Curated annotation (Swiss-Prot):
UniProt function note: This protein is associated with nerve growth. It is a major component of the motile 'growth cones' that form the tips of elongating axons. Plays a role in axonal and dendritic filopodia induction.
GO molecular function annotations of the record: calmodulin binding; lysophosphatidic acid binding; phosphatidylinositol phosphate binding; phosphatidylserine binding
Cellular component annotations (GO), alphabetically ordered: cytoplasm; filopodium membrane; growth cone membrane; postsynaptic density
Domain of life, per lineage: Eukaryota
Name of this protein: Neuromodulin
Family (UniProt): Belongs to the neuromodulin family.
Predominant place of localization: membrane
Compositionally biased spans, kind Low complexity: 80-95, 118-131, 172-198
Keywords associated with the record: Calmodulin-binding, Cell membrane, Cell projection, Developmental protein, Differentiation, Growth regulation, Lipoprotein, Membrane, Neurogenesis, Phosphoprotein, Synapse
Taxonomic classification: Eukaryota, Metazoa, Chordata, Craniata, Vertebrata
Organism encoding this protein: Serinus canaria (Island canary)
Limits of the IQ domain: 25-54
Amino acid sequence: TKQVEKNEDGDQKIEQDGIKPEDKAHKAATKIQASFRGHITRKKLKGEKKGDAPASETDAADKKEEGPAGGAAENKESEAPAATEAAAADSAQQEEGSKDSSAPAEEKKGDGAADTGSEQPAPQAATPAASSEEKTAAAAAPERESTPKASTDNSPSLKADEAQDKEEPKQADVPAADTTATTTPAAEDATAKATAQPQMETVESSQTEEKTDAVEETKPTESAQQEEMKEEESKADQENA
């Protein structure tokens, strides 16, 4: 029922206007055709002689008097290629727009690749510096462990000398490894740190030497005390006997 009402509304509008849309289109087509033909006939009139002008005018009048159906068909044919041309132009514009959009995208990709390329060397340069620092830390750890061992052991100064001999080649190897492995400013910082660490290690080694000397000095005092205790015990045993 609703569809029927819509159709009735359309019919009422047509009745009010008194002219159907098809009639409007047909009239517009006939006007366009008439103007187009009149333009062609004017060109012909200009090119032809004055005597032939009445004949051309009569031909134009005859063409205008042709059936309206033929005029409408010609109008549709003329409009169809125009529509196709407009569609082709739109598609060409869209293709150009897509090309333009793709070009910036490619440029952005290129820029992104350049950015990543510039960023990659920095981590690569940082890794050798980090590795050198790790090496120095690893070398310092066993050295620090060796120094407490030398202090805790109540051994003579020979072990302390051996520990020093072991530490010296390690200290010599660490800066050499740093200088060969790194060439960046970060590497220079790492080498500075590495040179500072051996200095600290030398200070620690000197402290261990002092500790060993102190231990050796305390040994004779302890032995003297033990001997005195033994002598007192022997004296007491003799008195008891």
